[in-house]
Amino acid sequence: LFNVLTGIYAADAGELVFDGKRIDGFKPHRVAQHGIARTFQNIRLFSSMTALENVMVGRHLRTRTGVLGAVLRTIAEEQAIVQRAHELLDYCGLAARANDLARDLPYGDQRRLEIARALATEPLLLALDEPAAGMNATETAALKELLERIRADGITLLLIEHDMKLVMGLSHSVTVLDYGVKIAEGEPAAVQRDAKVIEAYLGGSVS
């Protein structure tokens, strides 16, 4: 579903409409330009680039000349990109890591760096594919605080996640799929009590 939404896979049928515009058939960079950013279950950073440079790559999607147009950008434009990248690193708690290589960052920081890079595209919707995967309790708590801040700042979060404590603590609405079929949707507390959900995920019947 995430791969269809973000232009990696094409839908077999139907239309994909976001913010009143059809985006089915768009390549990932065009989807991003229309306001959808994503992170991946398996972290996809530029490991040999610094944290700052990784965020700048995301920011280039919002410039007139794109990633390959560095020679065409003015000094002022490039300075603005650098400044915004620094602001996003600070926003995500990574200001002190700006000049560190992505590969040298702790796992939790790499997760937050991927979010910072996604935010650099100025999304309306941030799609997060298992953002807490592999995190310890402390890292997950820090992630939750960051996501709550992003949501409070007006960006819609679309979350795939198996950490139910995180899901229930963050979500306004939860949709449950069982082998690709939607079996429940609604407020977190109601979905958590749903008999179909309990049976599908706990493997037993509910009286």
Feature locations, PLM:
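Glycine-rich phosphate-binding loops of nucleotide-dependent enzymes
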Residues: 1-207
